């Protein structure tokens, strides 16, 4: 009843417009001008280079994180070299010491990187050429168009690693690199670089991540943290460019039993600025070992462990650029007299930045089945708009006519009922909600998807109120439970905003998941459960687990369509905003 009253109030406002054609840009619910306060808070690149090198042979080469390669242009050894080259060079641009940047060439041809690279050209930043990391580090080049394009001489030396015998040496070197302004070189290639004139500035071959923290904590920025597994090179460019600390949870790749840096993680999280983002991911460990700790300490996790070029992707993200806004659902199209069992399907894991940069659009989002079931998609609106604004605009432009969008999971991955419970929760939660509200209003996103460990807890309800208080344009919240997603059993909570409107907080009723649970299962199983509970009129939210596969290799929107096709004429699929 409260929801209907809210719509009646909205329609009263529409009617007051009179004979003038109604446009949503005139709606008091939509702000066309949003203050900058709180809008831009993630590390990004603010200085525009004049040119850039494309560094080849890294992305997405299968051997890029192997420690067993002998070729100097293969393996983790080469990967870390190239990441450090890019990070140090891009940092030099930021400091005004260079006009040439480094872009890690995507040999996979992903649309997101193509568009972002084209955006550099559109800004007048032109590719100087394609070279491998060895050439960029060691060759001499003449200036071009008055721009010094040679990288050799820009670095003070090298940091030595032994990634095969000491996995943590690569993590330590990722920090030492920005401290010593030195590229990362492994013992495998030491002789080659010394012949090219490089001198060792720091020996990380026997160092641990704990050693790096003790030695370098005072030389690292508190604005963010990178968590990545040993034996990986991803995100090092970003960490080096922004002077960040890099931490691995497992001391050996994918093996929690070989030792962990849990106490170090907790210490570093306490040291960070409040609400500072934590980038990356860890492998071979349950999320309650690291995401839960990140959340409790008052930081959002940014899943982006298999994405690249974050410095140049984020270039000038805070500057005004043409925005592609979402399709806004017109509530006047609703027949309020219709009696149906309404079902809305939405896709999980929309907080995942790397997924947005890879096959999300082609395999999950821009597909005909999404239109068929009026699918709702969660996007990392607040974070992607800062980290990769070109790809964000691309995704907004690909939105299907009958599909709706929502912010997923509130500016990073965290649990709203545990967020910052170890450190000044009320203040930090309000800051997170305010930042999120500014972003959602700017991009005209009206729905919010969030996650809680216990969706019915008092702490979760406290968070619902904070989000509603921060955003007077919020139309509704959808909340998942960490496990199971449908732990809220479809219960709806009502939260009153500052304007006096009651905003629905809807818990997930069922989820399509390739495992058996009372409220989780195959499309056929969930359809049968919905039919068993059919009434004259009802509303159910069904979350589609992004990584589940069902009979006939159905997944995502095709799995939702399969479920919808097994419902009868008592049901109707609608998008979440509808």
Predicted feature locations:
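Catalytic grooves of carbohydrate-active enzymes
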Residues: 263-280, 343, 348-372, 382, ...
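Positively charged n-region of N-terminal signal peptides that target proteins for export
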Residues: 1-4
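Short, glycine/acidic-rich beta->alpha junctions
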Residues: 260, 387, 431-432, 457-460
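Short, charged/polar "capping" segments at the starts of alpha-helices
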Residues: 286-289, 385-386, 551-555
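Preference for solvent-exposed, low-hydrophobicity sequence contexts
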Residues: 20-319
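Hydrophobic h-region of N-terminal signal peptides that target proteins for export
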Residues: 7-17
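Substrate-binding cleft of extracellular glycoside hydrolase catalytic domains
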Residues: 378-445
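Active-site beta->alpha N-cap acidic-glycine motif
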Residues: 310-396
């Amino acid at each position: 009843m409260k929801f209907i009253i809210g719509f009646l109030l909205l329609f009263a406002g529409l009617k007051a417009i009179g004979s003038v054609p109604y446009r949503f840009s005139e709606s008091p619910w939509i702000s066309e001008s949003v203050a900058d306060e709180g809008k831009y808070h993630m590390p990004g690149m603010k200085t525009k280079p004049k040119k850039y090198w494309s560094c080849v042979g890294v992305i997405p080469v299968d051997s890029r994180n192997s420690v067993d390669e002998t070729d100097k242009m293969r393996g983790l050894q080469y990967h870390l070299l190239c990441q450090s080259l890019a990070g140090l060079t891009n940092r030099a641009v930021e400091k005004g010491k260079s006009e040439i940047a480094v872009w890690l060439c995507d040999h996979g041809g992903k649309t997101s990187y193509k568009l972002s690279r084209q955006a550099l050209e559109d800004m007048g930043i032109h590719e100087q050429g394609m070279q491998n990391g060895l050439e960029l580090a060691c060759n001499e080049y003449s200036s071009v168009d008055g721009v010094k394009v040679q990288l050799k001489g820009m670095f003070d030396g090298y940091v030595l690693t032994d990634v095969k015998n000491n996995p943590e040496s690569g993590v330590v070197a990722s920090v030492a690199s920005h401290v010593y302004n030195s590229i990362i070189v492994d013992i495998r290639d030491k002789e080659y670089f010394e012949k090219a004139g490089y001198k060792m500035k720091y020996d990380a071959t026997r160092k641990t991540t704990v050693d790096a923290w003790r030695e370098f904590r005072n030389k690292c920025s508190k604005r963010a943290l990178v968590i990545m597994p040993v034996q990986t090179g991803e995100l090092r460019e970003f960490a080096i460019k922004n002077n960040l600390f890099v931490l691995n949870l497992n001391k050996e790749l994918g093996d929690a039993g070989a030792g962990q840096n849990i106490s170090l993680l907790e210490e570093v999280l306490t040291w960070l600025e409040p609400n500072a983002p934590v980038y990356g991911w860890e492998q071979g460990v349950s999320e309650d070992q690291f995401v839960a700790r990140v959340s409790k300490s008052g930081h959002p996790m940014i899943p982006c462990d298999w994405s690249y070029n974050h410095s140049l992707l984020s270039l000038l993200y805070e500057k005004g650029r043409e925005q592609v806004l979402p399709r806004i659902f017109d509530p006047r199209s609703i027949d309020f007299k219709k009696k149906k069992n309404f079902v809305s399907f939405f896709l999980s894991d929309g907080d995942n930045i790397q997924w947005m940069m890879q096959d999300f659009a082609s395999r999950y989002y821009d597909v005909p089945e999404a239109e068929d079931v009026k699918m709702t998609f969660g996007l990392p609106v607040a974070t992607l708009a800062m980290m990769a604004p070109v790809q964000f605009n691309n995704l907004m432009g690909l939105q299907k006519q009958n599909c709706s969008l929502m912010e997923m999971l509130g500016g990073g991955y965290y649990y709203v009922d545990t967020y910052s419970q170890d450190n000044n929760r009320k203040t930090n939660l309000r800051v997170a909600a305010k930042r999120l509200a500014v972003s959602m209003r700017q991009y005209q996103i009206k729905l919010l998807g969030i996650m809680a460990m216990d969706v019915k807890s008092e702490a979760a309800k406290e968070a619902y109120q904070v989000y509603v208080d921060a955003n007077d344009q919020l139309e509704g919240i959808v909340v998942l439970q960490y496990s199971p997603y449908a732990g809220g059993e479809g219960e709806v909570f009502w939260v009153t905003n500052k304007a006096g409107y009651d905003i629905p907080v809807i818990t997930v009723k069922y989820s399509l998941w390739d495992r058996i649970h009372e409220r989780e299962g195959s499309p056929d199983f969930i359809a049968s459960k919905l039919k068993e509970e059919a009434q004259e009129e009802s509303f159910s939210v069904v979350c589609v687990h992004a990584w589940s596969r069902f009979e006939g290799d159905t997944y995502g929107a095709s799995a939702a369509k399969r479920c919808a096709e097994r419902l009868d004429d008592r049901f109707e699929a609608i998008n979440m905003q509808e």
